[in-house]
Amino acid sequence: VIVLDTSAVVAILGDEPDAAELTDRATLALATVMSAGTALELSIVVLSKWGPDGLVHLDALLRELRTTVRPVDEAQVRAGTEAYRCYGRGSGHPARLNFGDCFAYALARSLGAPLFFKGDDFVHTDIAPAHPA
């Protein structure tokens, strides 16, 4: 199982240059999971970029990737709080995680699962990537 971050899903939906490669990597996973917090962040980003049609494409992609949305529990709240303390914007750390990033980090930490993301924020944390950096 791998944990999805908003960044990778937006790259796929936005047909960025590496979208096909990201899709291939994600579909190789037996299953994908996403924090409810990430799901909300992702839906808001998709809605603002592509409108209601974007949400239709998002739902189809998440079905294709066999994605399960997991509720945020107390352990994730603690892990997300610690992530923001150590790696958040304003901490001085190069990861500069934002609020939404902390949901993905917390779920990956609580499951001991790798995180599927795009960009250079999570590479500066202690979370294992689900793909080569």
Where are the language model's segments positioned?
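Short, well-structured N-terminal submotif of metal-dependent ribonuclease cores
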Residues: 1-34, 47-60, 124
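Active-site neighborhoods of divalent-metal-dependent phosphate/nucleic-acid chemistry enzymes
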Residues: 68-114
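Active-site-proximal, substrate-binding regions of enzyme catalytic domains
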Residues: 43, 50-75
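Short loop->beta-strand "edge-of-pocket" segments that line small-molecule binding or catalytic clefts
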Residues: 2, 30-33, 65-70, 114
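Acidic active-site catalytic centers that drive phospho-/nucleotidyl reactions
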Residues: 5, 101, 119-121
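Acidic, PIN/NYN-like endoribonuclease modules and their adjacent C-terminal/linker elements
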Residues: 105-133
